[in-house]
């Protein structure tokens, strides 16, 4: 594995000396002649989370090199900075929260047209609470063989919230961004337990705290453990390694993984601006090819490469956390309370289960949650949800990259969805509340929730109307 000394990482195609290698490169060059790269030097952004792994692997294993790309990978301070830099063109593309480009399309926050042709990971998040909150939750949780029965539901928090309210204290929890997966998942868990996470009412009120019983606010992922340890928040939802970091530091307990909350949900995507994608179609496809190979490598042969992947991620220019902390979730296990380590082989999924394919239904689910909590503060037709998903998710580009890899002998047709794939997953009730999601009927889905907007309801003047 190549050692890098700087936060900005750069690599170029290696010139091979042997005649055989020269012949191979000449052949590759003739094949690529019809698809000349519009841009060879790229700068890609990420946030320090383990699910940025496909970017690190594509760099370290030379997959970007194979596509003729010179790539810099650069850590960003937070999701807003990252998103705005993609919009401005300072970054060619980036690791993004799955709902982030959808927020751009609907105009919640920065208005922008971002597209995604690659899902970077399924699952990979958890909800962690402070030791004090855990101490109060634990007596209400069923036990088996001396350990808590999972999944743990949010209704165990209700007596604690009542106590905080009686004492005049807010119950503060953190997520990473308003139009982010962690916000949607934390809200889902709380509401499934009968706890209101609050409404948005844009453009007047974008706090998301209207009517909230638990107060949610933004904290950048690497700052989550320290912010909780300081007492500013009592819990958070974030990706790894920042839940396992709380376990290792002895400051908190992850109470539920998102795999238990909603199985195999799209967590991160790779996003570029639509203008960039339109201007650089061949370069875009080349990037997706490299990322597909990286995701295949990460999930190959029952995760046999994960230890090497963890070594990459532990380097300071990537995630920079201790090897043991990252390995705790990347290698098919997950530690809840200290010493309570359990098998969770699909905590991080990069390729299996068609994990890297950009399903419209994943986008539609996130849009339903934006509507549920008022980020979309008006009723929309079922057709609108699919139309909006198609503005962002581009399975056509993904499959073009996949077919190129198949033609090159780097993948098999059976590795990918068939040509008949619609981009809509079958209805599923793999959620903590058992409510089935059918992406073809988003409004009917929303009407199933006890907490949240439905039908023609809107939030006005701090109240739900309609």
Task: Indicate where each model-derived feature is located.
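Short glycine- and hydrophobic/aromatic-rich loop-to-beta-strand nucleating segment
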Residues: 127-128, 269-272, 276-277
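Soluble non-cytosolic domains of exported or imported proteins
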Residues: 49, 76-80, 95, 177-181, ...
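Short, glycine-/small- and polar/acidic-enriched structural segments
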Residues: 34-217, 227-230, 234-264
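C-terminal segment of classical bacterial N-terminal signal peptides
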Residues: 22-32
């Amino acid at each position: 594995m190549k050692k890098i000394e700087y936060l900005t990482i750069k690599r170029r195609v290696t010139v091979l000396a042997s005649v055989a290698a020269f012949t191979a490169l000449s052949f590759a060059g003739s094949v690529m002649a019809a698809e000349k790269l519009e841009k060879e030097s790229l700068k890609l952004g990420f946030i320090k989370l383990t699910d940025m792994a496909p970017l690190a692997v594509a760099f370290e294993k030379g997959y970007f090199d194979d596509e003729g790309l010179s790539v810099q990978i650069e850590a960003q301070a937070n999701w807003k900075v990252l998103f705005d830099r993609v919009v401005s063109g300072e970054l060619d593309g980036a690791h993004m929260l799955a709902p982030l480009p959808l927020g751009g399309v609907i105009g919640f926050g920065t208005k922008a047209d971002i597209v995604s042709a690659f899902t970077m990971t399924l699952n990979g998040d958890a909800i962690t609470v402070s030791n004090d909150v855990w101490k109060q939750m634990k007596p209400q949780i069923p036990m088996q063989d001396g350990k808590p029965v999972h999944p743990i539901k949010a209704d165990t928090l209700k007596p604690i919230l009542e106590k905080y309210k009686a004492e005049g204290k807010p119950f503060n929890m953190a997520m990473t961004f308003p139009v982010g997966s962690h916000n949607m998942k934390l809200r889902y868990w709380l509401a499934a337990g009968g706890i209101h996470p609050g409404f948005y009412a844009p453009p007047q009120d974008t706090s998301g705290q209207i009517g909230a019983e638990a107060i949610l606010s933004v904290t950048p992922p690497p700052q989550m453990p320290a912010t909780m340890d300081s007492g500013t928040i009592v819990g958070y939802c974030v990706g790894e390694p920042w839940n396992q970091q709380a376990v290792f530091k002895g400051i908190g307990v992850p109470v539920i993984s998102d795999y238990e909350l909603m199985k195999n949900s799209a967590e991160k995507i790779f996003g570029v601006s639509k203008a960039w994608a339109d201007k650089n179609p061949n370069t875009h496809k080349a990037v997706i090819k490299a990322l597909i190979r990286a995701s295949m490598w990460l999930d190959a042969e029952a995760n046999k490469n994960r230890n090497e992947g963890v070594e990459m991620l532990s380097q300071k220019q990537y995630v920079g956390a201790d090897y043991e902390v990252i390995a705790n979730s990347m290698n098919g296990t997950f530690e809840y309370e200290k010493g309570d380590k359990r098998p969770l082989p699909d905590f991080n999924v990069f390729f299996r289960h068609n994990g890297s394919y950009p399903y419209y239904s994943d986008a539609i689910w996130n849009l339903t949650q934006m509507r549920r909590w008022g980020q979309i503060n008006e009723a929309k037709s079922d057709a609108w949800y699919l139309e909006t998903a198609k503005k962002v998710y581009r399975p056509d580009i993904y499959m073009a990259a996949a077919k190129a890899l198949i033609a090159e002998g780097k993948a098999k047709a059976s590795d990918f969805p068939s040509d008949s794939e619609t981009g809509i997953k079958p209805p599923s009730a793999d959620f903590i509340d058992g409510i089935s999601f059918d992406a073809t009927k988003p409004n009917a889905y929303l009407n199933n929730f006890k907490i949240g907007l439905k039908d023609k309801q809107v939030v006005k003047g701090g109240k739900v109307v309609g």
